[in-house]
Amino acid sequence: MSKTLYQKIYDSHVVCEDKNNTSILYIDLHLLHEVTSPQAFDSLRNKKRKVRQVNKTFATMDHNVSTQIKNINASGSMAKKQMEQLIKNCQEFNISLYDINNPNQGIVHVIAPEKGMTLPGMTIVCGDSHTSTHGAFGALSFGIGTSEVEHVLATQTLKQKRFKNMKIEIVGEIPKFVTAKDIILFIIGKLGSSSGTGYVIEFCGNVVKKMSMEERMTVCNMAIEMGAKSGLIAPDEITYEYLKNKMYSPYGIFWKNSLDYWRFLKSDSDAQFDKYFTIDISNLAPQITWGTNPDQVISINEKIPDYNKIDSLVKKDAAKSACKYMGLRSDTYLTNISIDRVFIGSCTNARIEDLRSASVILKNKKIANHVKAIVVPGSGLVKKQAEKEGLDKIFIDSGFEWRLPGCSMCLGMNKDRLNFQERCASHSNRNFEGRQGRGGRTH
């Protein structure tokens, strides 16, 4: 029977399944951070349970950490408490932790791929919605809640239902200055932020084949913004080259055996998908969101839509509300709107290729005096590599602050946040109301 990539990975991890297609799935890799794990560990203690597979469980500090100083006291009392609790839990249960003093510390969805923890064919979970990032390697990866974190810690399994299959084929030639982030934002805008609900999305096509692993991670990271369970891209030679000689990658005969298996991880040519879309990006321009939802997006050379001309009453009301919150008028260009902040970072766009691209644009230029801009590398290794290449100097010379790794301004959970009604051009994945701080306006 022909199968999709999703079906192949899912079926190979089923421990048992009932007549309603609800399965117990084996989990290959469990990633933890300081925010969604404390209650899970408390429950383990109360039930006198151990962590089932400590060698398949890794933790890092990222959401709450200060990006200005390596000190757990620097992000407030709640953040300090969560980080102290993570240290205690990892020590007690013998889990590897990349704390703020570890050179490998960083955003969980940046460090796992760069260390070779993320491998094709795996099932990967984390108490974070953008776990879909790891799907770029042909791994079935998705976010889970705190009670599910506890279940995986205790059993190394998870109760799951089967999702439907969606295929998005991206074709054409990538125009100059168009990035992977532009491509996925365009797709979200075209199909809608709920178009993926109930689906796992496989991205394919000649455009995807040409993408680097870091670009593929950006695409899969944003699959959740379509409402999808996860995003997937079949592994290929680009994947294998990226993984070769990583710390946790297979080696020797194990590498050869792994390659034999990984080459099987693709959808069969006659596999059936529940939905299929072909997206041509040949004429695409850089994209930017104007509203408070990722599908409220336009090309940089387009005007904000006139909500009075929108037929759908629901979409019209949403657009009107978004314009009010964002302090914008419809039928105007965003290029005429002044910004207060710039944020380069997040699990979507804080890898070395992202920093290289930004540095090319900023070299020998200065940002406006009134703009406060920060660059937050996705990990200690990204920061080290960027400094080796002199990228930090380019950013600093242009007026940016060069920060320590962390989630930073992606979410208003640490000291890096917008003030009321400040406007930010952001590399992050969400432009929800208040996402970067109360009353903050995110593009």
UniProtKB/Swiss-Prot annotation:
Cofactor, free-text remark: Binds 1 [4Fe-4S] cluster per subunit.
Cite the entry's keywords alphabetically: 4Fe-4S, Amino-acid biosynthesis, Branched-chain amino acid biosynthesis, Iron, Iron-sulfur, Leucine biosynthesis, Lyase, Metal-binding, Plasmid
Q: Which Gene3D superfamilies match?
A: Aconitase, domain 3 (3.30.499.10)
Q: Record's superkingdom?
A: Bacteria
| Involved pathway(s) | Amino-acid biosynthesis; L-leucine biosynthesis; L-leucine from 3-methyl-2-oxobutanoate: step 2/4
| EC code | 4.2.1.33
A Pfam family per the record: Aconitase
Which Gene Ontology terms cover its molecular function?
Answer: 3-isopropylmalate dehydratase activity; 4 iron, 4 sulfur cluster binding; metal ion binding
Any one GO BP annotation for this protein: L-leucine biosynthetic process
Q: Give me the residues that bind [4Fe-4S] cluster, please.
A: C347, C407, C410
Q: What class of enzyme is it?
A: lyase
**Catalysed reactions listed for this entry:** (2R,3S)-3-isopropylmalate = (2S)-2-isopropylmalate
Q: Which cofactor does it need?
A: [4Fe-4S] cluster
Family from the record: Belongs to the aconitase/IPM isomerase family. LeuC type 1 subfamily.
Report quaternary structure and partners.
Heterodimer of LeuC and LeuD.
What biological function has been recorded for the protein in this entry? Answer: Catalyzes the isomerization between 2-isopropylmalate and 3-isopropylmalate, via the formation of 2-isopropylmaleate.
In Swiss-Prot or TrEMBL terms, this protein is called: 3-isopropylmalate dehydratase large subunit
Tell me what gene encodes this.
leuC
